[in-house]
Amino acid sequence: MGNVASIAQITPIDQCNVKDMTMCGSDLYVATNEGYLIFDTKVGETKEMKTVGKLTSIIAKSETDLWYTVNLGRSSTINHVNGTETTTYSVANGAIKGGPYADVGAKGLAYGPDNTVWFGAYGFFHKFDGKEWTNYTCPASNFGRIYYKRFAFDSNGTVWVAGKDGQKNATFGEFDPVKGEQTPVACDFADDGVNSMFVDANDNVWIGTDYKGFYKYDGSTFVNYNKDSEANIDINIKTNATVGLCQATNGDIYYAFNKSLVCFSGDYMVVAGTVTNEDHPRDAITCLFPYGEYIFIGTSETGVHCYNTTTGEITQLADGTPVVSAISNVNTDKTKTSNAIYDLSGRQTKNLLKGQIYIQNGQKFFNK
């Protein structure tokens, strides 16, 4: 299953370049440009470190049932850890069909309906049914092949796919896996790129773009919340880049730009916190992963940080630093007995500035 790495052989969780994350129980799986780490968030300890190459995405059901993609430059491998064995799929070994470029840039691993596994690549996206891979060729754009990067699934069995073409124009569409047909959806972010996407409990598709903010699509209409909503928007949000768009259990939407984590509640859109380190001035947030009341924050130079949506605290993950006290029994009821008011750093406060976000009884409010 790859080489078991020592601490000296792979960059630790507080220093690594994070490419993707997923969660099983209290264990956080972190894909880096060297391999992957498994970090126990309750104990604050790295359980496993594997040097398996430059990862681009990872999904997992357990330590002995996980998938990851490895970037080899002009090709990629898709790898399944099953027990003590690892099976590698690629164009080179004949497992991935579609021609010599069908696994180039593989990323966006996702679990789909009926225990299927999906990933995107240059010109194709692929589905694994437990026995073999099926490749789907995307409709031709005006600029050649589409590089598919993101997948989302609704309760009706629809697969939503998004990517870019050769001129970095975005494509977003609805895919019917039964008919094997994709229907592109016209959108005003077609000259942008999609970097994140998910489906909420009401089957709305949420889409994070590189430069145009984030959208909700209800099957007929797009809403751009960076420009079309009536939310109070923090003056510190000076960009419409939305990295890692996701939803916390309380319904709030989160995304990142540069070093900042942004919270959108419907009434306000504010910077909830920042990841700063004077020794790493070029550090930036690369991805987010929501789990219970926590948002895990991956960065390019300082590893993983954890944002607590109840207290507003951000903690850098490191060996010896537990960040989650009971993640396997996450309390989704945010009601507290105390009426104290806290700012987003978790400090009790009485002095609220206009436009400041604060927490009372476990709920966030915007001070108009």
Language-model segments: residues:
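Sec-dependent, cleavable N-terminal signal peptides
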Residues: 1-9
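Residue-level recognition of short loop/turn positions
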Residues: 42-43, 63, 114, 156, ...
